[in-house]
């Protein structure tokens, strides 16, 4: 009988430790802010077609290619300017003086453009739109 009680106590103790461990793991997960009224600033992500629509309908925007200069020189979207993702840091970007300007951001595949968009938002830019990579671009490419 003592063995059964001892086993039950050990089982309860062990299960308490395990559930306590899991709750501390759950609490260590990063928080995701789902509040749409939050003051957290972010960028918009759109499809390639939506980007083309903006380019056809709007006139006051900048197309920002964040690839390396050698990639840019091999071919880019017409009228795009090149500011490599690696060059976007905590300093002002002379090519982008107006922080409220609509800026359409792309790279080769979409990874660097997302990263650059996040950096631009942190620098105070308020109208950043990321649309992926030139590998999906169906329009004209100039070099």
List each model region and its residues.
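Short, polar loop motifs at secondary-structure junctions
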Residues: 66-71
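Rhodanese-like catalytic fold shared by cysteine-dependent sulfurtransferases
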Residues: 2-7, 12, 17-54, 61, ...
């Amino acid at each position: 009988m003592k063995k059964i009680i001892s086993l039950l106590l050990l089982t309860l103790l062990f299960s308490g430790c395990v559930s306590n461990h899991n709750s501390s793991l759950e609490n260590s997960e990063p928080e995701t802010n789902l509040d749409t009224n939050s003051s957290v600033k972010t960028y918009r992500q759109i499809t390639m077609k939506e980007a083309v629509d903006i380019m056809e309908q709007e006139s006051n925007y900048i197309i920002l290619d964040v690839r390396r200069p050698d990639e840019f020189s091999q071919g880019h979207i017409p009228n795009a300017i090149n500011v490599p993702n690696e060059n976007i840091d905590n300093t002002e970007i002379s090519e982008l003086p107006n922080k409220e300007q609509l800026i359409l951001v792309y790279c080769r595949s979409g990874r660097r453009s997302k990263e650059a968009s996040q950096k631009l938002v942190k620098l105070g830019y308020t109208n950043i739109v990321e649309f992926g990579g030139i590998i999906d671009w169906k329009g004209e490419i100039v070099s």
